[in-house]
Amino acid sequence: KVQLEKKLSGIYRHHVMNKKEPLVRGFDDFFMAPHSRYTEACREDILNNPKLKVLADSKEAGIYIVMAQEGKQIFVMGHPEYDRMTLDQEYKRDVKKGIMPTLPVHYYPDDDPTQRPILSWRSHANNLYTNWLNYYVYQSTPYEWH
């Protein structure tokens, strides 16, 4: 883990690095996803580990999805589960605490926190969770029909 100089907060553009993996099946070449964190995984450590496969990356937010052990371990560095208002609530909470947070990027129309945030990641998030459940949970879970 590497400490960031300031909190990474916002909606970032990501690029699919390995389109053959079922986890990213149906993803657009580029997609948006939320991040909200003070640390990041060390890029060099991930890239230099032959057991890890990077599936999606972002120039601004860093590595996003990493897989190991043929999908038995999947690491998502962002927050695709966030709803429209989650980053807004975090930002306003931190403002009230006097932390003076950076405005979440690519989130508010015209960077105006009084406006309703833009929701640009729902289809990606739904696809990610659907693929994970279908290809890495259901199809790999043994069962017997009696």
Model-flagged regions — what are they?
Residues P80-H146:
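Acyltransferase
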